[in-house]
């Protein structure tokens, strides 16, 4: 996926959220401390770290869900935030359609619902019950719900949790495309080390505090990163920097970089404008897998 510079040379920085020396203290210990980060319009910033490193805590501070016990958190005035939590308290066994999920936090015009579902590639699932969605489809529905309110920034807490490998690649590709299409900022947290690296502009590595930060290449070459994740976490980065000019949508269509779509050629994994070969040794950003007798599912 092509990355866009968040602030080209000479352009004023448009900071949406900023944390300075922020920390949260609970039950006699610091959950996370000394966090410095900012997210600008059009920028993807990713929090990585092992379980318990403070990623969700830092994200909740950024959202003003948690008040910092030290330091400060500031938002741009009038900031609109779209939030996709790590866990959502919805009983998916109860009747709940995708379009109804979209309006749980408040009414939305029909055209906004339709546009958001189309943007994330699941317009064909508007009437579907959430209980029947795959993990990737449900995550897309949650992203659509956040996107429909036209946020300045999207905060995504472990957005690929419970999604298999090809689904993870597809969701990271989608996140980058939504950033490119809307110009919003993105703050996401992930325990993934490689797929996410190809989808982000800046990385903040947490382990109770900020271990290191910078571009993906800066972070993966940092001694602190290697100490935390081991040298095995460095080598495969380049594998995920191989990209195509297309994305496969869950409804079977092919979306190209110029915004056009096409139906795939029968018996092929690509449309008429390009080629995909899984045997070439690269991991591809396909957004579906095939199931017997059903729609492709992300």
UniProtKB/Swiss-Prot annotation:
Gene3D superfamilies registered for this protein in UniProt: P-loop containing nucleotide triphosphate hydrolases
Keywords: ATP-binding, Cell inner membrane, Cell membrane, Ion transport, Membrane, Nucleotide-binding, Translocase, Transport, Zinc, Zinc transport
Region (Disordered), start-end ranges: 273-298
GO biological process per UniProt: response to zinc ion
Domain ABC transporter: 17-232
Family listed: Belongs to the ABC transporter superfamily. Zinc importer (TC 3.A.1.15.5) family.
Subunit structure as annotated in this protein's UniProt entry: The complex is composed of two ATP-binding proteins (ZnuC), two transmembrane proteins (ZnuB) and a solute-binding protein (ZnuA).
The protein, known as: Zinc import ATP-binding protein ZnuC
Recorded name of the encoding gene: znuC
